[in-house]
């Protein structure tokens, strides 16, 4: 699909986003989320101004909700909810009761006679997701700096890293790894700067300009990443969460200057907008095609994906914020610190 088709799709999508924004379900946002017990898991989401319960399809491995069954969740006149279950020959209804804590946050739901807890996320409490490091943070940097980067064979293009802020001043930077506001809880970069290989940087600027008519701009969380930082990620991250970090034995696309982590900000307010999960949140909600949340969140992701695809970027399935430039394989792994660029 070329960039012109992608931009037309993005424009149509944005019209739907505006319609939903004007009618939304703000009062019921608290109900949206991931619920589960004893291995069973389901989502409650908003779609077209209505609530739905999504149940993972049978025989689907993992918890990604790549396929699911959806059921309407309707609010009655007395404020209670009913789940509408449709079958080949009949329709049944089940009462749904939500539970709240002292702060009026939803903690669980009763379906029939079973109670399911609602999963909590750091972003919902104004916090940043953190891992439980597998090694002491104090020794991670020294170990990574002493490690040897993998040797690659083949011909590569000469690196031409350029600083993104110099390419377009309207790009916002929120380089989390230059602060302790990240999943590791410690600064990993000595400077809050962002670099990409020149063709990727130029394509990213075009996306940022295309977003203007939708009222958005790009916010950059990470771009080129020295290899030693990828090594730190890997050594610190628990085995079950390694799907969210690159194996240093292969290197990251960030290490080549061919990947970028981004979100959207409002050009009206200058503030980042809600994309349905926090950046670097190691959870189901981070998956690019996560079907939960509300329509605006999902459509913002789709708008970003469409415009980025039109300029040669592909989204990483497990991370809505991560995009790889088409030519990332053409560049070598790099371990150059920012102050040397």
Language-model segments: residues:
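Bacterial N-terminal signal peptides that target proteins for export
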Residues: 2-12
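Hydrophobic helical h-region of N-terminal Sec-dependent signal peptides
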Residues: 13-18
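N-terminal signal peptide c-region/cleavage motif recognized by signal peptidases
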Residues: 21-22
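Peripheral terminal and inter-domain segments
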Residues: 25-135
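K/E-rich alpha-helical interaction surfaces of small helical-bundle regulatory domains
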Residues: 30-41, 308, 312, 319, ...
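Extracytoplasmic cell-surface/polysaccharide-interacting catalytic and binding patches
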Residues: 126-221, 236, 240-318, 327-341
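Beta-rich nucleic-acid/ligand-interaction surfaces
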Residues: 227-233, 323-330
């Amino acid at each position: 699909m070329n960039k012109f088709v992608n931009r037309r799709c993005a424009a149509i999508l944005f019209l739907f986003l505006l319609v939903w924004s004007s009618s939304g379900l703000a009062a019921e946002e608290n109900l949206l989320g991931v619920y589960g017990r004893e291995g069973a898991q389901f989502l409650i989401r908003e779609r077209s101004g209505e609530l739905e319960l999504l149940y993972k399809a049978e025989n689907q491995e993992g918890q990604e909700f790549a396929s699911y069954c959806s059921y309407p969740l309707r609010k009655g006149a007395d404020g209670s909810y009913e789940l509408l279950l449709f079958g080949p020959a009949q329709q049944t209804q089940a009462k749904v009761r939500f539970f709240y804590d002292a702060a009026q946050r939803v903690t669980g739901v009763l379906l029939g006679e079973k109670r399911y807890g609602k999963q909590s996320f750091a972003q919902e409490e104004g916090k940043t997701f953190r891992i439980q490091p597998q090694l002491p943070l104090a020794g991670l940097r020294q170990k990574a700096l002493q490690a040897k980067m993998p040797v690659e064979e083949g011909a590569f293009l000469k690196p031409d890293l350029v600083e993104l802020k110099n390419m377009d001043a309207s790009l916002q930077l929120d380089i989390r790894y230059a602060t302790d506001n990240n999943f590791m809880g410690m600064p990993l970069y000595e400077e809050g700067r962002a670099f990409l290989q020149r063709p990727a940087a130029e394509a990213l600027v075009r996306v940022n300009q295309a977003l203007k008519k939708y009222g958005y701009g790009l916010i950059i969380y990470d771009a080129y990443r020295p290899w030693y930082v990828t090594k730190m990620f890997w050594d610190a991250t628990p085995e079950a969460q390694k799907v969210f970090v690159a194996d240093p034995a292969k290197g990251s696309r960030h290490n080549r200057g061919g990947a970028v982590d981004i979100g959207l900000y409002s050009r009206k307010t200058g503030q980042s907008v809600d994309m349905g999960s926090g950046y670097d949140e190691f959870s189901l909600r981070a998956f690019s095609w996560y079907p939960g949340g509300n329509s605006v969140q999902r459509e913002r992701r789709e708008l970003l994906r469409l415009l980025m695809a039109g300029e040669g970027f592909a989204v990483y399935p497990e991370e809505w914020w991560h995009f790889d430039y088409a030519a990332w394989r053409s560049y070598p792994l790099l371990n150059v610190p920012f102050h040397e660029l």
